[in-house]
Structure formats: C-alpha cells, structure tokens
C-alpha cells in the first residue's frame, strides 16, 4: 500500500517521504478499524478510502506554507486536519466537530502519533467564535461541509488580517463562488484563481475555492 500511496500522490503532484506515508497509512487503517464500531465514515473499502479521504484531504497541502495556524471546521474523523498535520508537522492545527465520538477518535490518533500542536475539540463553530481571539487563524479549511456562503460567515470572524478560507468543494464550487460574489466583496475578501482537479482513481471532480482577506482589512 506504501507504493500505491506514493504513486497516487505523484498523480496529484505531491511528494511525501516514506515515514510520512507510513503515518498516513496507519491513520487510514485505524479509521477503518474504528469505523466498524462507531461509524466514522460511510466508506468501508480501503482503496476507496485511500482516494476519497486520504488523497482528497492532501490536495490542499500544496496551498499551505507549513508554519501557519489552521482551523478545520466540521472535521469528522479528522479530514483534512489529520492528513494536513501529518504532512506538515510544523503547523498548529485545531480540528473541530460537533460529534463527540469523532473527536474521541481524533484524540486517540493524536496520542498514538504524538501529534504536537494538534488539538481536536468537540464543539460547534458558533461557540468557538465566541471564545477564540478574532484574529486567531491564518487558514480555515472545510471539506464538503456546507454552502460557501455559510462557510464564509463562520470563518470570517476567526481569520486574521491575512487569513484565508480554503473550501474543499466538488464540481459545484465554481457555481457557489459566483452565488457568493457580493457577500465576498462586502466581507472584504477576494477569490484566488479556482483550482480544479480530478481524483486519480474515480475521476471525481474537486474544486478548491480560496478566499483571502483584502490587504488593509
């Protein structure tokens, strides 16, 4: 499976060292093992999970510097927060989901892999925004969570003055961006060029929508 992962990473333009891939594959195996007991994901096939969970989550990694403070909203079983943290260990990551059992799993993974600078917290984003500094995060990510309009409303108070929202979308990403154009301008953000890609096994279409605060906001 190590060679398989390396091959697929190459096909999305990403290269990771063997120890990093080993940790990613351990996480994948552990997620599928726990899934038999507590229903973390609807995907049970390892090859499918490799592509649609692990590889999909890693598509965002080339957009990250590696030293940022990142919030992952609605992270579920730790997607994309845990693959991001494994691939970019210098990042400080807060992973948030409202489902307690999924956070328990993430905390287990963090302990086993000794992920320093990673916190998994069971709460709603709305309550988080009341307790965190308004300029806390360099990056907010969300994978297949909700409409871009809602994502921007949730992320805006949690991003610093150079912060970015990275919304991991399917083929509807471009349409959602167009629908939110006025809201984006009013909030003081600008959209970076869309990144379209296809997952290498299924051909499933993905769109990375990146919204960045305008300078001086």
UniProtKB/Swiss-Prot annotation:
User: What are the annotated GO cellular component locations?
Assistant: cytosol
Pfam families listed in its UniProt record: GidB
Location of this chain's protein in the cell:
Cytoplasm
Give GO terms: molecular function aspect only: rRNA (guanine-N7-)-methyltransferase activity
As its record notes, the protein acts as a catalyst of: guanosine(527) in 16S rRNA + S-adenosyl-L-methionine = N(7)-methylguanosine(527) in 16S rRNA + S-adenosyl-L-homocysteine
Q: What is its EC number?
A: 2.1.1.170
Q: What class of enzyme is it?
A: transferase
Chief site of localization: cytoplasm
Listed A to Z, the keywords are: Cytoplasm, Methyltransferase, rRNA processing, S-adenosyl-L-methionine, Transferase
Q: What does this protein do?
A: Specifically methylates the N7 position of guanine in position 527 of 16S rRNA.
* Protein known as: Ribosomal RNA small subunit methyltransferase G
Species? Syntrophotalea carbinolica (strain DSM 2380 / NBRC 103641 / GraBd1) (Pelobacter carbinolicus)
State the encoding gene. Answer: rsmG
């Amino acid at each position: 499976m190590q060679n398989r992962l390396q091959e697929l990473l190459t096909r999305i333009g990403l290269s990771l060292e063997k120890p990093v891939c080993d940790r990613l594959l351990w996480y994948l195996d552990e997620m599928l093992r726990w899934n038999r007991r507590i229903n973390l994901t609807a995907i049970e096939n390892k090859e499918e999970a490799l592509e649609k969970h692990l590889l999909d989550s890693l598509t965002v990694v080339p957009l990250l510097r590696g030293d940022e403070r990142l919030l992952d909203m609605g992270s579920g079983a730790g997607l994309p927060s845990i693959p991001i943290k494994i691939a970019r260990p210098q990042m400080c990551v807060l992973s948030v989901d409202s489902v307690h059992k999924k956070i328990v799993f993430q905390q287990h993974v963090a302990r086993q892999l000794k992920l320093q600078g990673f916190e998994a917290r069971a709460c709603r984003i709305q309550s988080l925004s009341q307790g965190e500094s308004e300029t806390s995060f360099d990056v907010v990510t969300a994978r297949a969570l909700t409409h871009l309009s809602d994502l921007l409303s949730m992320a805006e108070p949690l991003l610093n003055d150079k912060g970015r929202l990275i919304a991991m979308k399917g083929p509807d990403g471009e349409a959602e961006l167009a629908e939110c154009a006025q809201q984006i301008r009013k909030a003081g953000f600008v959209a970076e060029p869309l990144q379209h890609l296809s997952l290498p096994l299924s051909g499933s279409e993905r769109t990375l929508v990146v919204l960045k605060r305008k300078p001086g906001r």
